[in-house]
A protein has these predicted regions:
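Structured domain cores in non-transmembrane regions
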Residues: 33-39, 47-157
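An exposed acidic His-Trp-rich patch
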Residues: 146, 153-201
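Bacterial Sec-dependent N-terminal signal peptides
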Residues: 18-36
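Bacterial N-terminal signal peptides
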Residues: 11-17
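Activation corresponds to long, low-complexity, non-globular regions
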Residues: 23-26, 184-236
Length: 236
């Protein structure tokens, strides 16, 4: 069950300005201290529910794992469609655990390609929004963050190498409509499928399934085009 390749994220730039505004947050990211940097609040809003995605929706257990990611430069990447998932991404996508990917990010930091770890809360069943703040500077202006669609075989949402410093300015606010990815590591076809390791592992793709298994095609609802949620990045 490996979807058609597509590496498009719908990104809407609401405004660009040199000065941002303040705000509060429900979570703080851990990582390196950023000197002369800027702070952003990431708000993850879920639109995954039985109304928008009714086919085999896992009522009572639908949730998202803790947000995990990093700020980095162009020499690093967390994931990419058309490429194999790292062990850390695989474990997030299959189990929601972040220990392995945090170790991978630590290795990237040791190479000098990542500045800060982004670590936020999960989104439990019945809740629709979670926030995390993080800092970055012009040398590490790219952001990558993922979270598991749970339960699922190996599905996740996120952004990779999103640039918050554009045309010499920090983006004031950026909304990303999230598509759902298949990590290529498990052959399960629906949210509650039993474990079935893919061998050999396949490349990350946008999630496409049979209409009887889920509503997803190319990462969004096959007929309505509904996205599973949004990431909003707002400068503080």
């Amino acid at each position: 069950m490996k979807p058609t390749r597509n590496n498009v994220l719908t990104v809407s730039v609401l405004s660009l300005m040199l000065l941002g505004c303040g705000g509060d947050s429900s979570g703080d990211s851990s990582g390196s201290t950023v000197i002369n940097g800027v702070t952003y609040k990431l708000t993850f809003k879920s639109d995954w529910n039985t109304t928008n995605f009714p086919t085999n929706y896992p009522s009572g257990s639908a949730h998202f794992s803790p947000l995990i990611g990093m700020t980095h430069n162009a020499s690093a990447s967390l994931f990419s469609t058309g490429k194999l998932a790292t062990s850390g991404v695989e474990i997030v996508a299959e189990a929601g655990s972040t220990n392995s990917i945090k170790s991978e990010i630590g290795n990237i930091q040791n190479l000098g390609f990542s500045q800060s770890l982004i670590e936020g809360g999960d989104l439990p069943n019945g809740q629709t929004q979670v926030e995390v703040t993080f800092s970055l500077d012009e040398d590490f202006s790219l952001v990558s963050v993922i979270t598991m669609v749970a339960p699922s075989p190996d599905w996740f949402v996120g952004v990779d190498s999103l640039n918050l410093f554009q045309n010499g300015q920090w983006v004031d606010e950026l909304v990303v409509e999230l598509k759902t990815y298949d990590a290529g590591t498990d052959d399960g076809v629906s949210f509650t499928s039993g474990n079935a390791d893919t061998s050999p592992k396949e490349n990350i793709t946008l999630l496409t399934s049979a209409a009887s298994d889920t509503d997803f095609s190319n990462g969004v609802h096959r007929s309505s085009g509904q996205h599973i949620g949004t990431f909003t990045f707002k400068r503080q």
